[in-house]
Amino acid sequence: MENMITVSVDNFNSFIRCLTNLKEVCNDADIRNGILRQRTNNHTSVFEIDFTSVFEDNNIALTNLRQKLELLKTFQGQEVEVTINESDDGTGGFYRFQDEHTSITFIAPTMDFMDNKYMDEEELNSIFPASEDDLILEK
């Protein structure tokens, strides 16, 4: 399945800023359905970033975040076309970022080899259980 998304200048710059903040604490970025929710390398923190305004409900997984971030910075200040090609069986696929002059394609990684994987709601709730009784503030 292949999807093509046009990302505005502002949205792409915001995406790059977020990844820049993460590159020191995460080796990978795993976006599922437009949401990046994962642990840091040392498993001491969990963070969630909503990228649905950038990538809609698509999936993008980037390994070696520091290296790929430097390549993606070449598109800052420009509208970027992103092609997401995901295979149905979970093998293969690619992510292509391009403007009118440049195109960079990343092979989709095998999820088994990613350090920082997407956390679903169930896993997050098992780590941080919350109920009405746990709330400090009331309505």
Regions found by a protein language model. Name each.
Residues 1-21, 26, 30-139:
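DNA polymerase sliding clamps and clamp-related checkpoint/processivity subunits
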